[in-house]
C-alpha cells in the first residue's frame, strides 16, 4: 500500500476523527465527482487514471493555458479553480505549477472539496502549513501526491523492512538523475525531484530527519539549482545520502537500504527489488575479507506484482475520502518533507549543517 507512516510529532491519517467522509460515494454506482486543475505533463496522466478508476468520475477540468495535450475530451476547459468548483465537486486533483498550489488549494478547502495536491504541497513550508490547516479545520481529506510511495519496489521494500528482514537499518542512499525536463520552470531540482527522495526515505525508514548538509550547483543557465548532493541523519542514527540532478544523459531512480543483514536495492524505473545478503561463509583470503568488511552472500531478485503507481495513488485517495482506509500521504507529512527541503537549500546557501 502507498501508506503513511506514523512518526513522533508528525500527524498522520491514522486518527480520522473530525473528517467528513463521503462513505456513501466512491462506488461504481455512485462515483465521486472529481475536478482536475492543471492539464500539463502531470495533469494529463491524472486525467487518464481518474477516468480509469472505479468510483471516480472526471466531471470538470480547468487550465488557464488551455488543453495542449488534448485530455479534456468532451469536457469544456474551464478558466480557473472557481469555475471548477462551480461544476459541483466531491474531490479535486491539483496539478498546477508549484507557485499556484497554495491559492488553488485554499480555494478548494474553502469550498469544502477533498483535495490531493501534487508534490510539493506548496512553494514553501509556511504556505504548506496554511494549506494543511485549512483542510484540517474543515474536516476535509487533504493529500499530497508523492507517487513514489506507490511504486511496487518501494512498497515491497517497506514491507520487508517492517518484517525485520534487514535487521537494524544503517543507511539509506538514493540516486535520482536524468536529463533536464522542459516541463519545470518554477522550482529547482530540490523541490521537484529531491522532495521525492526525502519523503520516501523518512517513510521507508520510519524515522524523521534530524540534520542535513547539502551542496547545489547551477549549470543549465537557470536561476534555480539543477544538481544536488546531500547527506543527513535520521532518528535512531540512520545515515542518508541523496544524489539528484537534471544534468545526467540517462535516467536513474535507485534507493539502497543497507542494514545488519545486507542491502536492498529498489529500482523505481523498473519496479524491481533485489536483496544482497551478507554471506555466512568466511573468506579464506584474509586480505579480501578485511577489505570488504562483510562477505558477499546470496542475491535475490523478488517477483513483485506491478501496477501503475499513479493508479494506486488515486485509489488510496478515493478510499481515504470514503473513510475505507487511510493510505494516502497527508498534508502534515507533506509539510514535514518541505521543512527538510528548505533545510537542504539553507545548508547549500550557507554552507553549513542544518539541524531539524
Please report, for each region that a protein language model flagged, where it lies by residue:
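C-terminal helix-rich "cap/oligomerization" subdomain common to oxidoreductases
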Residues: 1-28, 91-93, 316-356
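N-terminal Rossmann-like dinucleotide-binding module
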Residues: 2-73
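Beta-loop-alpha module in the N-terminal Rossmann-like domain of NAD(P)-dependent dehydrogenases
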Residues: 6, 20, 46, 75-133
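Hydrophobic residues in well-ordered beta-strands that form the structural core
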Residues: 117-118, 142-144, 266
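A contiguous active-site-proximal alpha/beta segment in oxidoreductase catalytic domains
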Residues: 122-184
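C-terminal glycine/acidic-rich active-site capping loop/insertion
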Residues: 147, 261-332, 356
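Rossmann-like dinucleotide-binding domain that binds NAD(P)(H)
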Residues: 181-250, 254-256, 332
Amino acid at each position: 500500500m502507498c501508506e503513511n507512516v506514523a512518526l513522533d510529532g508528525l500527524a498522520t491519517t491514522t486518527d480520522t476523527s473530525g473528517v467528513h467522509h463521503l462513505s456513501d460515494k466512491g462506488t461504481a454506482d455512485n462515483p465521486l465527482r472529481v475536478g482536475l486543475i492543471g492539464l500539463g505533463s502531470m495533469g494529463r496522466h491524472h486525467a487518464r487514471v481518474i477516468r480509469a478508476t472505479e468510483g471516480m468520475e472526471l466531471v470538470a477540468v480547468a487550465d488557464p493555458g488551455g488543453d495542449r495535450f488534448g485530455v479534456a475530451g468532451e469536457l469544456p476547459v474551464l478558466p480557473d479553480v472557481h469555475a471548477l468548483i462551480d461544476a459541483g465537486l466531491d474531490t479535486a486533483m491539483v496539478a498546477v505549477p508549484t507557485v499556484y498550489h497554495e491559492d488553488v488549494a485554499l480555494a478548494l478547502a474553502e469550498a469544502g472539496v477533498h483535495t490531493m495536491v501534487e508534490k510539493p504541497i506548496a512553494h514553501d513550508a509556511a504556505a504548506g502549513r496554511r494549506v494543511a490547516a485549512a483542510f484540517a479545520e474543515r474536516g476535509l481529506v487533504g493529500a499530497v501526491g508523492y507517487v513514489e510511495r506507490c511504486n511496487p519496489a518501494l512498497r515491497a521494500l517497506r514491507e520487508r523492512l517492517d518484517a525485520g528482514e534487514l535487521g537494524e537499518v544503517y543507511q539509506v542512499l538514493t540516486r535520482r538523475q536524468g536529463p533536464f525536463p522542459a516541463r519545470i520552470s518554477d522550482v529547482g531540482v530540490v523541490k521537484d525531484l529531491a522532495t521525492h527522495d526525502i519523503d520516501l526515505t523518512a517513510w521507508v525508514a520510519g524515522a524523521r530527519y534530524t540534520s542535513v548538509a547539502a551542496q547545489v550547483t547551477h549549470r543549465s543557465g537557470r536561476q534555480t539549482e539543477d544538481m544536488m548532493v546531500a547527506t543527513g541523519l535520521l532518528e535512531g542514527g540512520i545515515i542518508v545520502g541523496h544524489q539528484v540532478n537534471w544534468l545526467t544523459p540517462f535516467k536513474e531512480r535507485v534507493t539502497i537500504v543497507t542494514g545488519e543483514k545486507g542491502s536492498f536495492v529498489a529500482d523505481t524505473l523498473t519496479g524491481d527489488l533485489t536483496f544482497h545478503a551478507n554471506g555466512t561463509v568466511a573468506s579464506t583470503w584474509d586480505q579480501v575479507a578485511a577489505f570488504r568488511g562483510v562477505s558477499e552472500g546470496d542475491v535475490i531478485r523478488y517477483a513483485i506484482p506491478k501496477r501503475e503507481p499513479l493508479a494506486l495513488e488515486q485509489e488510496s485517495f478515493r478510499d481515504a475520502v470514503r473513510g475505507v482506509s487511510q493510505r494516502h500521504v497527508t498534508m502534515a507529512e507533506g509539510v514535514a518533507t518541505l521543512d527538510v527541503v528548505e533545510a537542504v537549500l539553507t545548508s547549500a546557501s550557507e554552507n553549513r549543517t542544518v539541524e531539524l
